[in-house]
């Protein structure tokens, strides 16, 4: 009977007693809900349902604590919570699950989840039944084995009821965990096992990125140890760069299928592929500058030449010089072609010698270009002579087309091919000669279906030159207008929209969309072309290709790069050409004829040329025409050039007469033409086996063509930008946009990943104590910041209350009484009551020293070491108040009213409540100010009050200090722990930390100068409202009420 009576005590803090009172409250609310019709009184029903769910939360929270103590490691694992969204893991999740289980057990269904509700209904019924059994057994234990205010359970394990409780808790724990997984999975999307593993790999990528950034000096270890907020933006940005070009086989491998990517980066797959293509064209120095830019947001240094950014556009004088130089090179090319055709039977040694010398020339030119030397110096080398095939590949050689070697092997193909392509071209020729020849080839290729008109038209070349020059000027002007400079007011959403052609064409320079649609057609054409070539003829053509200067440095450099990467090579140095055969044959389009390739076969060559252009595709036409006219003498070569110009001129007139076939010369067409020609040339260079021409080497040729296509696309991607600075700026916008979008779309996942990364990469000295040390100097003001401990362990840093609007002294924090909520008084209230009471007795020093000792003891318990010297400052303040005590008589009534507003009339009660608060408070409390020390030392004495000090106090009284959020893990009224969703709120009257429910009142505080309503706790609101009502109603009783504190202190 004694135990039953004691269990009714509200101040018992044992687990069983707390469960008993919570369960009784829940039962009372449930009974009241059942006592009336909710449809008749909806407001009352809503209010009671809210109370019911709060009580359910409290009962399940206490039950969970009991299970933690009794079951321990035998509890059912809840590792599945790692797959839940962070927003689901709230403190009231258990209450929501209980409420949902009762609704499902009663026959209700989740909205739009009828099938899932039907499946969960048996489990919900089992959960509610098991929970009811646990509540009955726990209530019985409360009456049997409760120990008042015990921190642990004292159960009789030899009792059968205790054993029954133990088994019931295990069953309920298992059922509740199973129901939690089913219910949450039906309500919100839950990660699959693969998605969770991919998120872990993303965390590994972030950690590796941070370690790499620390190693190369982009970040500092002190930033990691201090949890620098800037790292939360820098690490995801750097991780995107590292995942695309450094850790290419990691979770950001864009070659894997889209459904295998992490759900965080799956929406950005297209833009990440384009970013990767651009990153592969950056040199090591450019990549480092981009990563530094992503960390610091500094401006790009345009004074330092990076890669080829210092190369400027050519002047007209340079264009003229380049034209003459190119003509000389063509002459040299023709002479060398004739000499090579006459010595084609010299075997493979000659081919090896010429190839090796060409490789050396390429290396010299690449080094020469990367060192920003003279732009025309390499044009005089015979190995760099231009052919139409080479011109078509280097048509867009802008100043940014020559990056240095790549930091990773995965992008060496693109970078080497790009460097080889542009190293053979003087930069002064980037706008005139290259595009001239390219457009000529394009126009010739578009005349395949007009053989008869081709023979009839014989206009001169001047009109063709003028037409092509006009077209090229229009193209260059369009390219300049559509260059990659950023639009100032364009947001990230507009940049990522694929429908906006002016942005997406130049946003990231990738030609996947252009070449993707023609990939199947190109492969079919290549296969047909390979089937038409005979093995012996192809070997002879390969021998010719080795001897031709038209193969030039770009092809050889690409072949050399592919050989280093163990990829299919187009070099046939190991092939032995027949030395006895002095004539090489070329397969005619009909497949039945072969004609000798000599200087005396001009007419046959011209006739077959037209039949060839009539029957073959555009790319095959370029290939065969290229091989024919380079194996004849110089006059014949000039004759073919004249025919080609006439064909172009004919196409010009044909275009004007047939408006139904508009002539579209644009950048995409030129690049597609270059792509087809490169692929066809590379495809033709692959040696076919003698037995089966379409077997394994055909697949090797296709693989080589794909590699070269990738290199060309990466090169043409960079050509969209005018300078390296513009390219880096655009990459910064793209990468930062994707990383910052993760902060919005996947905030919870990103927080979990970054939290793990910080914990992994912290220095060992920071692992022990993460909390921010408190400031110890009195002159320094305390500005609250969310502690890292809250951010990491409680996930509460980002959702805590805002920083204090006032700068607060650490000495001004108050002492709160949390357990005795009905009679809570702060030391700040005591300060307000007694701050102007002066000492008149002889035991001033004794009381002052005792108060100072008490203050120092409390301060040291909080780590505030500076309060030890506050006794001297208190003596000085007391002397100043003694000098002003004669001036306080006129404001006595105002001071008495302020005493009434505090809610306590006895200083001794304030002292006792403060000491009780110091003993019972669950949080670390802080000491008072100098004025509070003086007020505490003045207890038990009489005083007089001067008007000036009271007036100054009434007008300049500062608000009480706020308890730091890190010192208050629970609400100071209801003791509910704070979480990411239960935020902290400070009372402006007492400075305490409360939850939103306990601090939902607002009232003006004129004594602090706050005339508008501000947030106050419930108890301060009651006191303030009561004082505001009593102050005008009882003006005549002010003197009597004010005399009571003095009488009490005198007694």
Curated annotation (Swiss-Prot):
PROSITE patterns: ZF_FYVE. Zn(2+) 2 binds at residues 987, 990, 1017, 1020. Zn(2+) 1 binds at residues 971, 974, 995, 998. Residues 305-440, 516-552, 566-703, 837-968, 1028-1051 are annotated as: Disordered. A zinc finger (FYVE-type) spans 965-1025. Residues 607-637, 650-672 have a biased composition (Basic residues). Residues 319-358, 392-401, 409-428, 533-549, 568-582, 597-606, 840-852, 879-924, 937-960 have a biased composition (Low complexity). CDD domains: FYVE_LST2 (cd15731). Keywords: Metal-binding, Phosphoprotein, Zinc, Zinc-finger. GO terms for molecular function: zinc ion binding. Pfam families: FYVE. Residues 371-391, 518-528, 583-596, 692-703 have a biased composition (Polar residues). GO terms for cellular component: early endosome membrane. This is Lateral signaling target protein 2 homolog. The lineage of its organism: Eukaryota, Metazoa, Ecdysozoa, Arthropoda, Hexapoda.
